[in-house]
Regions:
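Catalytic cores of extracellular degradative/oxidative enzymes
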Residues: 309-353
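Glycan-recognition and processing domains
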Residues: 104-193
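Beta-strand-enriched, solvent-exposed domains that form extended recognition/catalytic surfaces
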Residues: 152-296
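Post-HExxH zinc-binding segment in Zn-dependent metallohydrolases
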Residues: 27-46
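Short alpha-beta junction capping motif
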Residues: 1-27
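Eukaryotic non-catalytic protein-interaction modules, chiefly N-terminal intrinsically disordered
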Residues: 58-138
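Solvent-exposed loop/turn segments at secondary-structure junctions
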Residues: 8, 13-18, 41, 47-51, ...
Length: 353
């Protein structure tokens, strides 16, 4: 219908749809139609006021034109003028947030640029000013788009991971463990709305993925294609709204479980979680995790104070979890190495809450 020259009006948006669904580019119903026009519906929200001018839009608002301009900027020239830099940044950044790696006309040139320029390093002693340089900002967005999409066997340890979330000790052993997780998760009542009522529940494993390393995880068939995920990294926030960064904006990664055998990883490393959607009733499930690092973990009513003091707090991963009845603390392991009274601490928090 569209390709034969007819018109179509699409009503609706994908930002709310994207809260409980994945892969906007392929799975959002409107994007099964829109690409034939050269357009996509993104999951971003925007202003309801749109001014349609008498002249065509800036050419740099076209994705491939912006990619070509950026590629030329780093190779043959010309340099992108300052008057176009912000437009190029916004155009490409919107696409990196949505387009998957199979959009090769978009991603292949960008991957070549990252290979040539290297990774942007951000650390406590090497801060990054957002909005100071649109070209640097768009390269940061491109790098993020890649490390959140590359298959596990193509990931490398990000140079910034040593600073945050921290390095795994060089002598830390890699282990294989069978871990039991609770697959029953109600979620918050829908009335919580924007407070993440329909967010997944994170179930800890006590294991850590080293930066850039492949972790193999085997799960029961009952979890496959049920919107159950593997999350690597406890920090699921985004810092893109800040003015100054002392770590990268996004350092966690989710893998949707679509097979009984998953190969996962994170360029920054992080604690390993199995996350369940609201209204899950899977019961206790056993997952096998291979090539991970043991992390300090206290579970109220399960871990004894002797086990904590003699074994758990000494485990090598750089982040630890303390689980009370109502509250979980996720903290750098350096903060708990000398914590002797973990039972008293978590009982205090449970009483307070």
């Amino acid at each position: 219908f569209l390709t034969s020259g007819h018109g179509l009006i699409l009503g609706g948006h994908s930002w709310y749809w994207s809260y409980s669904n994945s892969d906007v580019a392929h799975n959002y119903p409107g994007n099964k139609i829109a690409p034939t026009t050269g357009l996509f519906v993104s999951s971003n929200s925007g202003s309801a006021q749109v001014t349609i001018g008498a002249t065509p839009p800036d050419r740099m608002q076209r994705t491939l034109a912006a990619v070509t301009a950026l590629q030329n900027h780093f190779t043959t020239g010309p340099l992108i003028p300052s008057s176009d830099a912000s437009t190029v940044e916004k155009t490409i950044s919107r696409s990196t947030a949505m387009l998957t790696l199979d959009f090769i006309d978009f991603w292949n040139p960008l991957r070549g640029m990252v290979n040539a320029t290297g990774w942007t390093e951000i650390a406590e002693n090497k801060k990054y000013d957002l909005d100071a340089d649109p070209i640097a900002d768009v390269m940061l967005a491109i790098q993020e788009g890649l490390y959140l999409r590359l298959p596990a066997n193509e990931l490398v340890a990000h140079p910034s991971a040593v600073d945050f979330p921290g390095a795994v000790p060089a002598n830390a052993s890699r282990v294989t463990e069978i871990v039991s997780v609770n697959g029953d998760y109600i979620g918050l009542p829908s009335g919580f709305g924007y407070s993440g009522a329909r967010s997944h529940g994170m179930m800890g494993t006590g294991l850590y993925a080293a930066a850039g390393e492949v972790v193999n995880i085997s799960v029961p068939v009952a979890l496959v294609d049920q919107n159950v995920r593997i999350q690597i990294g406890a920090h699921s926030d985004s810092l893109w709204g800040k003015d100054v960064l002392d770590r990268h904006p996004k350092i966690h990664r989710n893998w949707v479980i679509d097979s009984t055998t998953m190969h996962v990883g994170n360029t920054f490393g992080g604690l390993i979680f199995i996350t369940f959607p609201p209204d899950s009733t899977f019961g206790i499930v056993n997952v096998t995790i291979e090539n991970a690092v043991q992390a300090p973990r206290y579970i109220a009513g399960v871990t004894t104070e002797a086990e904590w003091n003699m074994t758990q707090r000494l485990l090598p991963a750089p982040w630890a979890e303390l689980e009370g009845e109502f509250f979980i603390l996720t903290v750098p392991s350096s903060e708990i190495r000398s914590l002797d009274s973990v039972v008293e601490l978590m009982e205090w928090w449970d009483t307070a809450l």
